[in-house]
Amino acid sequence: MAQYIVTIFSIIACTVYYAVSVVDFYLDPNLIAFIALSTHTISIIYSIILTAATSAITGVRRVIVQRATLNGANGPVAMNGPDPFWKLIYITNLILNSAGIVRVLILQRASVLHISFLYINSALGAGLLARLYLSTLRCLLPHKTYLQLSIWGV
């Protein structure tokens, strides 16, 4: 039962975070947002194809195929070993998250939705990056800006 709750929450969080990426790109078109949106789209399509095509992945691991952060850099493991394309997606997402941190710290531009859903999206798996991201915000953003973010529960 708990596995299904985690699965449903993961799918909802991933979907909402993707929607926020779309809105973020629509409201403020820039290269980082475009690359992030493109990578999200490619990884979602690839995950769906991989989930549908790989019969060697068990039911639990099918969920992991949908959520890179649940299994980290190793990704889904089938009979042939770890999926090499998964590592590419994982590393690309790691670079994009780092670019997001730079965007916030240098440009000091981040929507409350972006930060909130980054936190939600990372809560189930690789929360370390999200914690570093939020801790960096707390330490380096101007106090008034962080207070505005804190009002929204971040």
Swiss-Prot record:
Spans traversing the lipid bilayer:
5-23, 34-50, 88-107
What is the membrane topology here?
Answer: Multi-pass membrane protein
Q: Which UniProt keywords apply?
A: Membrane, Transmembrane, Transmembrane helix
Superkingdom is Viruses
UniProt-annotated location(s)? Membrane
Q: What is the protein named?
A: Putative membrane protein ORF51
The answer, when asked if Transmembrane is one of the entry's keywords, is yes
GO cellular-component term (any):
membrane
